């Protein structure tokens, strides 16, 4: 029997970064699970850009999505990250408030890590029990 790592409602999030790996992965998960957007968030700290799709412009945003009929998973997909640390901090706080209102117990963020050429999954945890659980699942903890 495998050890349960996460609580009853988990958020998996990805935003652009190194190679947009986190964003691409989160977008893929959301599409594969046929997720529906249920909340949008914006930040005044996003880059001064406007995405255009099919001739329609919109603001950069963070989308919260959920697979239809499920209440145990939220997928966070972001168009961009704020440019300055104060804006990053504020957006992170707003995201955490919204996720708490949906009773999210765990947040897993996806990103790339530049360091080795090996195919390895790296992770960090916020408490020792989670660190042990991640290691037990084959995740290499960053030093």
Region annotations inferred by a language model:
Residues 25-27, 90, 121-124:
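Short, glycine/charged-enriched secondary-structure capping and boundary segments
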Residues 36-37, 106, 141:
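Residue-level detector of short coil/turn "hinge" positions at structural boundaries
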């Amino acid at each position: 029997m495998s050890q349960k790592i996460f609580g009853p409602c988990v958020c998996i999030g990805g935003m652009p970064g190194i190679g947009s790996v986190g964003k691409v992965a989160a977008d893929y998960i959301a599409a594969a699970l046929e997720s529906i957007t249920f909340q949008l968030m914006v930040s005044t700290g996003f880059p001064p850009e406007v995405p255009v799709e099919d001739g329609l412009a919109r603001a950069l945003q963070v989308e919260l999505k959920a697979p239809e009929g499920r209440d145990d998973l939220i997928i966070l997909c972001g168009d961009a990250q704020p440019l300055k640390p104060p804006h990053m901090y504020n957006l992170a706080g707003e995201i955490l408030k919204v996720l708490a209102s949906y009773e999210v117990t765990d947040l897993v963020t996806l990103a790339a890590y530049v360091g080795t050429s090996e195919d390895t999954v790296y992770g960090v945890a916020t408490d020792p029990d989670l660190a042990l659980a991640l290691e037990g699942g084959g995740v290499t903890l960053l030093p």
